[in-house]
Curated annotation (Swiss-Prot):
The protein, known as: tRNA (guanine-N(7)-)-methyltransferase
Annotated active site: D152
Role played: Catalyzes the formation of N(7)-methylguanine at position 46 (m7G46) in tRNA.
Claim: Cytoplasm is one of the keywords in the record: no
EC code(s) of this entry: 2.1.1.33
Organism field: Haemophilus influenzae (strain PittGG)
Record-listed substrate binding positions: K156, D188, T225, K226, F227, E228
NCBIfam families: tRNA (guanosine(46)-N7)-methyltransferase TrmB (TIGR00091)
Catalytic activity entry: guanosine(46) in tRNA + S-adenosyl-L-methionine = N(7)-methylguanosine(46) in tRNA + S-adenosyl-L-homocysteine
Family listed: Belongs to the class I-like SAM-binding methyltransferase superfamily. TrmB family.
Keywords assigned: Methyltransferase, S-adenosyl-L-methionine, Transferase, tRNA processing
InterPro entries: SAM-dependent_MTases_sf, tRNA_(Gua-N-7)_MeTrfase_Trmb, tRNA_methyltr_TrmB_bact
GO molecular function: tRNA (guanine(46)-N7)-methyltransferase activity
Group of enzyme by EC: transferase
Amino acid sequence: MTQTFADQKRKTVETAEFTEDGRYKRKVRSFVLRTGRLSEFQRNMMNDNWGTLGLDYQTEPFDFAKIYGNDNPVVLEIGFGMGKSLVDMAFANPDKNYLGIEVHTPGVGACIAYAVEKGVTNLRVICHDATEILRDSIADGTLGGLQLFFPDPWHKAKHHKRRIVQPHFVTQVIQKLSENGFIHMATDWENYAEQMLEVLSANTDLVNTSKNGNYIPRPDFRPLTKFEARGHKLGHGVWDLYFVKK
């Protein structure tokens, strides 16, 4: 069976890197490539709409004004899952541009399908490693905000190094934010919430908007996600953090 464009995307979510002597350089990933298959519908959505809703990884910064056709602030969301809440936010905020990153191709296909259904035009999606996109494809000072909702908690202590929220990640994000740009995170794992708070609070370029110096109630503009609903059913709390760049 001939592989389509959508089938190929899963194989190119990150670029290979090698040591000086030519050996493959292993990376500490914050994600796992799941083996879920694209449905025929999701595949068709990706193949038919990538030209208008998709972006490919590149080694030079994106020209957001050209991509979106305006100078509205760009909000980046990393790990949007199936994309429903991301599309809903884009639909509700036409004065903002949204850029979503997800390595799971069925999620990318589902997000595109829902965006087409809603008629959303201020959204683009990428199927690639977010750390490489931040490093290579986004210029400093060009993001209005970052959203990171319910990232993989890597709950075992030996796997905490795989959590995406680390000091070097936050430093990288801050470089990409414009003045007064925001970082909004949410998790239903208390231990991860504590780590997020510690890492974000330690960076002197950020200000916590919480009146108590820790977490905020879920704001109305963040849709209730299936992960949050799942957490409620399991008796988990949910913690939102909202910091602003000085």
